[in-house]
Amino acid sequence: MGSLSIWHWIVVIAVILLLFGRGKISDLMGDVAQGIKAFKKGMQDDEKTAEKPEPVKTIDHNAPAPGASRSDVGSKTTV
């Protein structure tokens, strides 16, 4: 009585088919498959962006900084 026999499973499947119908179950499975595909695609996109290295930035010490013009000509300096 505690274990489920094959007849119990047949009755359960028959009730599910009667409640949902074949069309709804196939639509549901299609939606699940689309969700899994979208999830896998999102995971692949995340891996691609993580693998892409950031460009190396260099500093040119000889070039003056933009907007940093020196205007100390003619200014008074105190010692």
UniProtKB/Swiss-Prot annotation:
InterPro entries according to UniProt: TatA/B/E, TatA/E
Family matches, as NCBIfam families: PRK00720.1, tatAE
Statement: the UniProt record of this protein carries the keyword Transmembrane: yes
Single Gene Ontology MF annotation: protein transmembrane transporter activity
GO term, biological process aspect, one: protein transport by the Tat complex
Keyword terms: Cell inner membrane, Cell membrane, Membrane, Protein transport, Translocation, Transmembrane, Transmembrane helix, Transport
Coiled coil: none
GO (cellular component) term, any one: TAT protein transport complex
Compartments, as annotated in UniProt: Cell inner membrane
Region (Disordered): 43-79
Similarity comment: Belongs to the TatA/E family.
Keyword GTP-binding among record annotations: no
Predominant cellular place of this UniProt entry's protein: membrane
Function as written in the Swiss-Prot or TrEMBL entry: Part of the twin-arginine translocation (Tat) system that transports large folded proteins containing a characteristic twin-arginine motif in their signal peptide across membranes. TatA could form the protein-conducting channel of the Tat system.
Subunit structure of this chain's protein: The Tat system comprises two distinct complexes: a TatABC complex, containing multiple copies of TatA, TatB and TatC subunits, and a separate TatA complex, containing only TatA subunits. Substrates initially bind to the TatABC complex, which probably triggers association of the separate TatA complex to form the active translocon.
Name the record gives this protein: Sec-independent protein translocase protein TatA
Transmembrane region(s): 1-21
Listed Basic and acidic residues bias regions: 43-60
UniProt superkingdom: Bacteria
Gene3D superfamilies: 1.20.5.3310
Protein topology in the membrane: Single-pass membrane protein
